């Protein structure tokens, strides 16, 4: 574990105990105290090995029990320390500040791992200022991908708010923590629900086709919404060719022509005809012209475009 100077100072203060730590902190500036305290609030537990390395760097005479770990949170070390150095009021304010910052940091890490489209579905109902603030904290590439899903006017509003952003005030910080916590909870609940759908789909795919049909038919009569979710999830790319023409025409209206052209270039003639008969002659000729060109398209890109097309089909079917 690589520690910077302030982190090493935090470890050392934890080892020398409250009384000696107080005497040391009295010699430091308020900013230095805040920086070290912030390190303590973020570090949580330090292994005895790491602590021993810090000790050996500063003082060869000091050693610790090899079974002893250092916890800044569980033993209330930082709380007692700050109260004695800064007074209870300032200590509480500082600890609340660190707690909020840590919560934001932890949850932003989680948001950075969530698919951009999923995040859009989570935040699209939020105020543009909330969306802008979330994007500020996210990884830049991740934030850019999320922004691309919004319509132009909203994107412009979000960018303007990002450009004018200065900082989160204390009250705003606390509210922001609650908002992100809520988003994470909504995502986790949706994932649990989604996992149930996935399991149901996997089971239906393993049973005989006529039995699957009977189950879905009965489900449509008792719980149409759930049945549609399962049926939509079961759809595969190869099933697109069997869709009714009315769905193909809806798909053509919403799916980018250039992406469809890339897919068509590698698909069989039967698949192409399914789309050609449902689109204008102009678009048909544009796709045919593209397919006739010698253009290399990677398998990864083709698979991505196919997934995009399949997802568009699923949305149409689910909302119909």
Swiss-Prot record:
One of its GO terms (biological process) is chemotaxis. The keyword rRNA-binding does not apply. PANTHER family: FLAGELLAR MOTOR SWITCH PROTEIN FLIG. Belongs to the FliG family. SUPFAM superfamilies: FliG. InterPro entries: Flg_Motor_Flig, Flg_Motor_Flig_C, FliG_a-hlx, FliG_M, FliG_N. This is Flagellar motor switch protein FliG. The record marks 161 as: Part of the EHPQR-motif. It is a peripheral membrane protein. It comes from Buchnera aphidicola subsp. Baizongia pistaciae (strain Bp). It comes from the Bacteria. The gene is fliG. GO terms for molecular function: cytoskeletal motor activity. Keywords: Bacterial flagellum, Cell inner membrane, Cell membrane, Chemotaxis, Flagellar rotation, Membrane. It is found in: Cell inner membrane; Bacterial flagellum basal body. A motif (Part of the EHPQR-motif) lies at residues 126-129.
